[in-house]
Regions:
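Conserved Walker A/P-loop ATP-binding site and its immediately adjacent core
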Residues: 111-132, 222-227, 355-356
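Conserved helicase/translocase motor-coupling segment
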Residues: 287-368, 386
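Conserved helicase ATPase core of P-loop NTP-dependent helicases/translocases
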Residues: 148-152, 352, 360-361, 371-407
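Conserved P-loop NTPase motor "coupling/switch" region that bridges the ATPase
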Residues: 147, 157-158, 183, 200-285, ...
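SF2 helicase motor core recognition
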Residues: 170-174, 223-225, 359-363, 386-390, ...
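Conserved pre-motif I regulatory segment
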Residues: 51-89
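A conserved SF2-helicase RecA2
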Residues: 427-436, 440-519
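Conserved helix-turn-beta segment of the N-terminal RecA-like "Helicase ATP-binding" lobe
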Residues: 122-145, 235-239
Length: 520
């Protein structure tokens, strides 16, 4: 035991290649294991299970699945049989819904029911997918109190498949599942985060009683490594320890000057990546869709007009969170004209912005001042109408103007355009990745170019650096090349200053009454 204690003191500094060379590890007094590979060595040192081996699959796999999807279902089946849950984190556009449907259909072939929890905007996607499979016992719960809605609630008490939104999951479970579901599927599962969130607690409760749990998301680490924890807890219980231990181990957790825990960083990334591989299936488009057309990116830094500079400086002289919001709005207004120029030239495009006010303004200016027809999608548009507008744009050749929160995820827009325009660079980098994937996915035949518009001497100088930092954390843990490419594209356009340095320079210039110097 003393040898093991000595070894563990510096185990954190050893690479997995070094661990693999150890002929035996003393993991308990009087018990020695033989030579093991790096993965198993890490598993034993960390107290977690080794990766489950692929087992012969007794699932009814339908025709039409691609080879990588068949392999994905096999792997998921092995993981859920071993661990009780699995994380399906394939890149956007690789058919996660189809794989999840195949898995759940197989797991409930003889008996059992499936509860699918998803954002409202993908309810119809699930209904379409289940219909393609020939599933007849499907009930979709929608908000409302008409006779049709009341009938759906009654049907949900016996239906094999029940599909509902995250907001309604708790009520659906309590009123329609007298016996726990055999399979619980959480689509766009990154929406479940925040240890104290009511939604997360309810899903954790449901998950404890479900036989199998599957969480689907192309962006499991929504912003920072700390976002993983709640997802992992719902799927695997205490396998990753307490939230505090997770933050300290993997999120660079440290006590700050105010006595709180700062968990915004990343630490032991290789170790976390290794552990996640036991529980997760993840493939990139570039690795499995060889026929997918290329994706390129460009960043265009716009010079601010005198009016934009005045608005931005006036906003930054304010105080509190409102000042940041005002500064972001000033930045977005300052980029409208160059964005209009680019969209007018492209004619067919997908344009994302941040707020519906900006989306309405851009769409109106394109239609009335630039002779550029387009459809408009914002959050106040009913979910059912969004897909029809996309189909209209695809058939008519019109552009699409949308807010990133209303159309940046869950909607298939391949064939709508080959040019994507990012008017607003979101603080959450994985929103950008999801938005890019609306075009760059199965069914797209033309090369896709995404153009990011940023304005010098504005909040974009801060936001871009913040996004680059977060993408670096993602790449360290997930090892995903496409997000590393986005990080490099944005990072190559800025200098070595941190976002704090840039903010300090902005405030210093304001105090001195002058303008910023050349940016980037």
């Amino acid at each position: 035991m003393s040898e093991y204690t000595v070894f563990m003191k510096d185990a954190d500094e050893k690479t997995y290649e070094e661990l693999a060379k150890i002929p035996g590890l003393r993991i308990g007094e009087g018990r020695v294991v033989g030579r093991i590979d790096a993965c198993a060595a890490a598993a034993r040192l960390l107290g977690v299970k080794a990766p489950p081996q692929l087992q012969p699959v007794d699932l009814p796999l339908p025709d039409g699945l691609r080879d990588y999807q068949v392999e994905g279902v096999k792997r998921l089946n092995a993981i859920v049989k071993e661990m009780g849950g699995a994380l399906l984190a394939d890149d956007m556009g690789l058919g996660k819904t189809r794989q999840a449907t195949a898995l759940a259909a197989g797991l409930t072939k003889k008996s059992g029911r499936v509860l699918v929890v998803c954002p409202a905007y993908v309810r119809e996607t699930w209904l379409d997918e289940l219909s393609k499979w020939g599933e007849r016992s499907v009930t979709v719960i929608r908000p409302g109190n008409t006779k049709r809605h009341v009938r759906a609630w009654e049907e949900a008490k016996t239906a094999k498949w029940v599909v509902c939104s995250y907001e309604m999951a708790g009520k659906v479970y309590e009123e329609c599942f007298y016996d726990a579901p055999r399979a619980l599927i959480m689509d766009e599962g990154h929406l479940v985060k925040g240890r104290d969130a009511k939604r997360a607690k309810k899903l954790e409760e449901i998950g404890k009683f479900a036989t199998y749990r599957l969480l689907m998301t192309g962006t499991p680490m929504w912003s920072r490594p700390r976002d993983f924890y709640q997802l992992l807890r719902i799927l695997f219980g205490s396998a990753f320890g307490t939230k505090f231990n997770f933050d300290v181990r993997y999120c660079g957790g440290r006590i700050n000057d105010w006595g709180g825990l700062d968990n915004r960083g990343v630490s032991n990334a290789e170790e976390l990546q290794h552990r996640l591989s036991y529980y997760m299936v993840r493939r990139e488009k570039r690795d499995v869709l060889k026929e997918l057309p290329p994706l390129t990116r460009q960043v265009i830094w716009c010079d601010p007009t005198a009016e934009a500079t005045r608005e931005f400086q006036a906003a930054m002289r304010g105080f509190g969170a409102g000042a940041v919001s005002d500064a972001l709005n000033a930045t977005l207004r300052g980029k409208v004209e160059p964005v209009l120029d680019y969209a007018q030239q492209a004619r067919r495009f997908l344009l994302f912005t941040y707020m519906k006010e900006h989306a309405h303004q851009i769409a109106e200016l394109l239609r009335t001042k630039r002779d550029t027809p387009c459809v408009l999608i914002t959050g106040d548009l009913p979910v059912e109408k969004r897909a029809s507008l996309i189909a209209q744009a695809r058939s008519s050749g019109q552009g699409v103007v949308a807010t990133i929160d209303s159309a940046g995820a869950g909607l298939n827009m391949q064939g709508v355009a080959s040019v994507g325009i990012m008017h607003a660079i979101d603080w959450v980098p994985l929103k950008l990745a999801q938005a890019e994937a609306r075009l760059h996915r199965m069914g797209q035949t033309e090369p896709v170019q995404w153009v990011y518009f940023a304005m010098r001497e504005s909040m974009d100088s801060v936001v871009v650096r913040n996004v680059v930092e977060k993408l670096g954390q993602w790449a360290a843990i997930m090892g995903q090349q496409s997000n590393r490419d986005l990080m490099d594209t944005l990072g190559d356009t800025v200098d070595g200053r941190t976002e704090k340095d840039v903010l300090a320079d902005i405030y210093r210039d304001l105090q001195e009454g002058g303008d910023n110097g050349d940016e980037d």
